[in-house]
């Protein structure tokens, strides 16, 4: 699907019956979550809540809420410029070629490589003046997050939570900007807590800034309601040589239009010119905090694990200015026990990951992140095994290949005769091909998701690999079982008879 911006995208979705509008008042406090959860579980449409209820003084918010946008894999594919899930493998192949290009083996391959390189070059983002995202500007006391219909998703949540904010940062020693999606707890009229984990790009940029420029505010811009390609580019494993804005242009089929921020100290940051709302501001110094910058206690919030997370300290982002389009749309979501939007995104991005993994490990024939595994905590790998110990090599390869798999706790490796997308087959392989002592790999003291309260130490825990492949000589001294399979000729004969098998012959 080709589109210009978020508004064009949702307009096309509406024409396809993939988006519906809700005209009656609905509160962003819990009610939107319940409605969206039911819609997502039923494979339902994206929605626009036209009358968010509960604004200050009991009014209706003037800003509608867009939700459940990526609630189906089909809409994720549309957002990535594809027409179907199958097309996402092609995006993975492009990323694979960009990540590790191979020398061409002839003129034809050289031509393809040149065409790909030119396509990427042609999608370099462009700066524009008079952008739509700055049609309206709030400054001074007008900067008040209570004027936006920010969701409170679950009964035990500490506060309203910005969920789809595209956070733009830049380290002092880097040429390119970093785009990341980090949740932000509202703690005041113009302040939120920026929850980014230590290894994420935004946190790394902030740490470098604090070391290089101690005591100086750290500039940040947050784009709300960016176009889907830019949002999805921020959560895709884009090669370090390619900017997320450039990749978004490649997905969308048109260069990403960028705008400079209005705040002078944010001059090095660029935001999507078509974004619905932009927050401009800084993390301010605080000499009384050990880090030298303002921090606050974040959480608890219901998360994609299906649990409330524990509280922890994160930087405070103070907003100096809010710019927006005329009649803006607020894009929101919730996270909870799978399935939720992160789980759906995980299933779709899974198809992008497969060609990337196959480039490094050609023996991998399929790869699956089951949504029940909270997007990335469990991976199932199907492979063509070639030697003893091969499955264990693949396990460690997956854990170390992409940053996205650093937090994968469980990897199950099976042979090429097992469908990793069918739990019945995976369980059959585990129960018939695994000896727990021989075929289980445990690795201690590895990076673990901060939200994984099952780990003994926050951010540090163990991983498990299960080798559910047939065992080769050297892995067992016993005669290995042979899988039962019907004769191919008999299967073909029954296939031809099947439709008429229960018909009575004429005259009987």
UniProtKB/Swiss-Prot annotation:
Residues noted as binding prenylated FMN in the record, renumbered to the chain: 181-183, 195-197, 200-201
Main location: membrane
UniProt-annotated catalytic positions: 303
Cofactor: record remark: Binds 1 prenylated FMN per subunit.
Protein's UniProt keywords contain ATP-binding: no
EC number, UniProt record: 4.1.1.98
Gene Ontology molecular function, alphabetical: 3-octaprenyl-4-hydroxybenzoate carboxy-lyase activity; metal ion binding
GO cellular component, one term: cytosol
Localization: Cell membrane
Enzyme class: lyase
InterPro entries with a match to the protein in the record: UbiD, UbiD-like_C, UbiD-like_N, UbiD_bacteria, UbiD_Rift_dom
Cofactor: prenylated FMN; Mn(2+)
Protein's pathway: Cofactor biosynthesis; ubiquinone biosynthesis
The entry's keywords: Cell membrane, Decarboxylase, Flavoprotein, FMN, Lyase, Manganese, Membrane, Metal-binding, Ubiquinone biosynthesis
UniProt keyword Transmembrane, yes or no: no
Residue positions binding Mn(2+): 178, 244
Summary of subunit composition and partner proteins: Homohexamer.
Function, as annotated: Catalyzes the decarboxylation of 3-octaprenyl-4-hydroxy benzoate to 2-octaprenylphenol, an intermediate step in ubiquinone biosynthesis.
Similarity comment text for this entry: Belongs to the UbiD family.
Protein name: 3-octaprenyl-4-hydroxybenzoate carboxy-lyase
Underlying gene: ubiD
């Amino acid at each position: 699907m080709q589109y210009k911006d978020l508004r064009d995208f949702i307009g096309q979705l509406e024409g396809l019956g993939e988006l519906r509008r809700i005209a009656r008042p609905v509160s962003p406090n819990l009610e939107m979550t319940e409605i969206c959860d039911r819609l997502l579980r039923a494979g339902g449409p994206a929605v626009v809540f036209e009358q968010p209820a509960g604004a200050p003084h009991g009014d209706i918010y003037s800003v509608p809420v867009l939700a459940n946008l990526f609630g189906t894999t089909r809409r994720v594919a549309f957002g990535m410029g594809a027409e179907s899930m199958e097309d996402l493998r092609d995006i993975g192949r492009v990323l694979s070629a960009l990540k590790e290009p191979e020398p061409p083996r002839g003129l034809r391959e050289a031509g393809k490589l040149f065409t790909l390189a030119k396509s990427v070059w042609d999608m370099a983002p462009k700066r524009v003046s008079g952008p739509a995202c700055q049609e309206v500007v709030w400054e001074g006391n007008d900067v008040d997050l209570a004027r936006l219909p920010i969701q409170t998703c679950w009964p035990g949540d500490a506060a309203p939570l910005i969920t789809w904010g595209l956070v733009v940062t830049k380290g002092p020693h880097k040429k390119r900007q970093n785009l990341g999606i980090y949740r932000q707890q509202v703690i005041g009229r113009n302040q939120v807590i920026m929850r980014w984990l230590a290894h994420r790009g935004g946190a790394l940029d902030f740490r470098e800034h604090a070391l290089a420029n101690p005591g100086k505010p750290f500039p940040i811009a947050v784009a709300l309601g960016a176009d889907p390609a830019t949002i999805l580019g921020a959560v895709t494993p884009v090669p370090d040589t390619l900017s997320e804005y450039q990749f978004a242009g490649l997905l969308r089929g048109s260069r990403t239009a960028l705008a400079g921020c209005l705040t002078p100290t944010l001059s090095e940051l660029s935001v999507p010119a078509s974004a619905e709302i932009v927050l401009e501001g800084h993390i301010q110094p605080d000499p009384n905090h050990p880090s030298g910058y303002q921090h606050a206690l974040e959480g608890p919030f219901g998360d994609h694990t299906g649990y409330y997370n524990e509280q922890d300290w994160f930087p405070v982002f103070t907003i100096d200015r809010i710019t927006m389009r005329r009649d803006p749309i607020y894009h929101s979501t919730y996270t909870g026990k799978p399935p939720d939007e992160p789980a759906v995104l995980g299933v779709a991005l899974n198809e992008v990951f497969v060609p990337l993994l196959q480039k490094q490990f050609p023996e991998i024939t399929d790869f699956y992140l089951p949504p029940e595994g909270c997007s990335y905590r469990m991976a199932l790998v199907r492979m063509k095994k070639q030697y003893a110990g091969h499955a264990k090599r693949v396990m460690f390869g997956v854990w170390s290949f992409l940053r996205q798999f650093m937090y994968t706790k469980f990897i199950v490796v099976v042979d090429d005769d097992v469908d990793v997308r069918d739990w019945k087959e995976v369980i059959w392989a585990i129960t018939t091909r695994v000896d727990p002592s021989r075929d289980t790999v445990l690795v201690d003291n590895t990076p673990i998701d901060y939200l994984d309260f099952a780990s003994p130490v926050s951010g540090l825990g163990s991983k498990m690999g299960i080798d559910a492949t047939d065992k080769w000589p050297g892995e067992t001294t016993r005669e290995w079982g042979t899988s039962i399979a019907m004769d191919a000729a008999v299967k073909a004969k029954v296939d031809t008879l099947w439709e008429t098998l229960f018909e009575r012959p004429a005259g009987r």
